[in-house]
């Protein structure tokens, strides 16, 4: 993310959205580059990750984290470079993982940083395949889903960073993996490049029937990222004692009220009861022991080196 000399560009939350965010939701501001005080470091953002959870942080509602306040910098995880340091343990040129959000420069006392060293290889990976999205996939699938060889795993949003990683780990664990994505190009990528056994286009008029045909033995694990009609299509296919890690419900994030159509609440709860389904929502920051992250880094590093996990980034230059 290139900076403007002597200017700190900040994207702030200017208005809470009602439904889809629009041009009034965020505002670009220009301010002075902050000066670090005693015990502080000055950070320059190099990479910013844009993730679905940010939509929820725009709402003034009870959640796992405080909402972004009006006028505050929009939240986000970044890889940043230390430009000045008055903080022990951080030197000029260190790269760090920080939560400083949508801005060119930020100050930190170091307590919220993870030092990646002077010259980390592929620094942007710490926002993706070696960071929060892939760790979400790893922990949710292995700790909640507990996949066993021969089971069928269905992954919503299979072409995204979380879903793509879930499916590849499930294949490593010996499962049949069926992805769900939006469009034939995404589905082709999921099967041809990521190695899923099948991928269904949720935009197809025959989606529910196609999903049923792709899961002849039913569904043992459904990794939920989407909600909505995808969830409703999976429900009748769940086997007894199926597991459903709930990572997100992105199709509902921009709703300002209840979704249109029939009330599926009774069907959802009835299926959970009859089929004895384990449904567990989780937030990656506080749902698992800290030691699990070390296991993730060890395993993912090995899978990347062996080629068992493949990773594709989309990088956009500029704020």
Predicted regions and their residues:
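Short amphipathic alpha-helix with an adjacent loop that forms part of the alpha/beta core around
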Residues: 206-216
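Glycine-rich phosphate-binding loop and adjacent beta-alpha segment
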Residues: 229-309
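Short, glycine/polar-rich helix-capping loops at beta-to-alpha or helix-loop-helix junctions
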Residues: 104, 182-190, 207, 264-269
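NAD(P)H dinucleotide-binding glycine-rich loop of Rossmann-like/cofactor-binding domains
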Residues: 74-84, 89-157, 199, 308-309
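Short glycine-centered segments of the SAM/dcSAM-binding site in methyltransferase folds
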Residues: 95, 152, 176, 242-243, ...
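Glycine-rich beta-strand-centered segment in the early N-terminal region that forms part
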Residues: 32-50, 58-102
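Mid-domain Rossmann-like dinucleotide-binding core that forms the NAD(H)/NADP(H) cofactor-binding site
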Residues: 127-205
């Amino acid at each position: 993310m290139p900076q403007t000399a002597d200017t700190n560009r900040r994207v702030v939350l200017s208005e809470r959205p009602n439904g889809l965010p629009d041009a009034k939701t965020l505002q670009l501001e220009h301010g002075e580059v902050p000066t670090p005080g005693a015990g502080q470091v000055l950070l320059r953002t190099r990479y910013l990750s844009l993730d679905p959870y940010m939509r929820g942080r725009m709402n003034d509602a009870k959640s796992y984290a405080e909402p972004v306040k009006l006028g505050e910098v929009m939240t986000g995880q970044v890889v940043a470079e230390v430009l000045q340091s008055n903080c022990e343990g951080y030197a000029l040129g260190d790269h760090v993982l920080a939560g400083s959000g949508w801005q060119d420069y930020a100050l930190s006392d170091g307590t919220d940083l993870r030092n990646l060293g002077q010259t980390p290889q592929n620094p942007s990976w710490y926002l993706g395949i070696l960071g929060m999205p892939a760790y979400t996939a790893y922990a949710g699938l292995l700790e909640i889903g507990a996949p066993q060889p021969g089971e069928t795993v269905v992954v919503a949003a299979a072409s995204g960073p979380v879903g793509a990683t879930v499916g590849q780990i499930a294949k490593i664990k010996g499962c049949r993996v069926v992805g769900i994505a939006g469009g034939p190009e995404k589905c082709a990528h999921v099967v041809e490049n990521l190695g899923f056994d099948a991928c269904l286009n949720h935009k197809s008029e025959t989606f529910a029937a196609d999903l049923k045909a792709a899961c002849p033995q039913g569904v043992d694990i459904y990794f939920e990222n989407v909600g909505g009609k995808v969830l409703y299509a999976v429900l009748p296919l769940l086997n007894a004692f199926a597991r459903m890690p709930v990572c997100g419900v992105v199709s509902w994030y921009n709703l300002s009220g209840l979704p249109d159509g029939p009330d599926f609440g009774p069907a959802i709860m009835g299926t959970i009861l009859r089929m004895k389904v384990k449904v567990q929502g989780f937030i990656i920051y506080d749902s698992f022991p800290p030691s699990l992250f070390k296991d993730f880094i060890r395993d993912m590093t090995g899978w990347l080196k062996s080629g068992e996990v493949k990773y594709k980034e989309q990088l956009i230059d500029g704020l």
